[in-house]
Amino acid sequence: MINCVLKKYYNAILDEHDLAEKARNDYFKPVTVPSQDYKTWRAVLDLKTCFNCADNHGRIFDIHDPTVMLPPLHLRCRCTLDNIEAIEAGNATNNGTDGADYWLKHFKTLPSYYITRPQLEALGWRYGDRPSKFAPDRMYGGDIYYNDDRKLPNKTGRIWYEADINYTPGRRNNHRILWSNDGLIFVTYDHYHTFYEII
């Protein structure tokens, strides 16, 4: 049992390193400001990390939620709750005011150049294929994002959706925009590891 636990946290550290490496190869860095509404849980991931701290690592919490337990959770807790970064709508993608972040913030819908999975499948696309091969100059998006790791703020009745952003023809990258049915919008540039709020 102990070996399984140690292996899980060792693999989490390796996964974090791999994600950081991929993010360096797929770089987009907009201007950010500290969020006024959200904080993210940061745990030191090593063999001394407790289950609760490791489970909360990377989760985003509403600053104004009185039910959030603040670190330290225990005597030797090394966790922090830090403001996440926020990006003004229109700056989170390389499309400016024609980008998904701007459109979702101001019009509550994706721009017209997005195509859904059913539309792609009708063109012959299958999972693993490059979307641009079947729909040139279109971007893939609109699927439900299940938030299984609960990193994004969770609430009864909240549904998350996702779409690709910032990719060049022929190649999907690690950049995604995520939005909820109740108006929250976040982006990630390292495939769901780190999130930025859209303001």
Residue spans for each PLM region:
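Generic hydrophobic, helix-prone segments enriched in Leu/Val/Ile
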Residues: A100-L104, I177
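N-terminal domain-onset segments
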Residues: S112-Y113
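Functional cores of ribonucleases/endoribonucleases
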Residues: V33-V44, C50-A54, L123-I199
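Catalytic nucleophile-His microenvironment captured as a short glycine-rich beta-strand/loop
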Residues: L75-D82, R176-I177, T194
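Second-shell loop/turn segments in exported
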Residues: W103-T109, D182-L184
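Domain-core detector
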Residues: M1-R76, D82-G99, R117-A122, R126-M139, ...
